[in-house]
Design a protein with these regions (language model features):
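Basic nucleic-acid-binding interfaces
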Residues: 2-4, 8-23, 29-109
């Protein structure tokens, strides 16, 4: 588990809040920026398809993620879209050839 992921889990445990599933899609023409955006998103969710992530985020995590992404985006060239899914919509997601979106839970013993 990366340090960023550990920090996100520690933060989540501390705030003990509700999360929302976000489907995050990005279109970044520059290879270096695209790689950086991909690395940032890997610390917050699951890479499901090329340029597409599923992330279960609290409000604070969403703000943190957007802030980190904004540091690397060129507004006139890059696009990142956040699609929130309600709990009922997550349950109704249909997949072919892959697992449905589920929140990874961390249990500390």
């Amino acid at each position: 588990m990366s340090n960023r992921t550990k920090a996100a889990w520690k933060h989540r445990r501390q705030e003990n809040s509700q999360t929302t599933c976000y489907v995050i899609a990005y279109d970044i023409p520059d290879d270096r920026r695209r790689t950086k955006i991909h690395q940032i998103l890997m610390g917050f969710g699951k890479w499901t398809q090329y340029s597409l992530f599923e992330c279960f985020l609290s409000r604070k995590e969403l703000v943190l993620l957007r802030s980190k992404l904004a540091e690397h985006l060129v507004e006139q060239q890059d696009s990142v879209r956040f699609y929130p899914l309600c709990a009922n919509c997550v349950k109704r997601v249909e997949t072919v050839g892959g697992p449905p979106p589920v929140e990874d839970l961390l249990f500390v013993v």
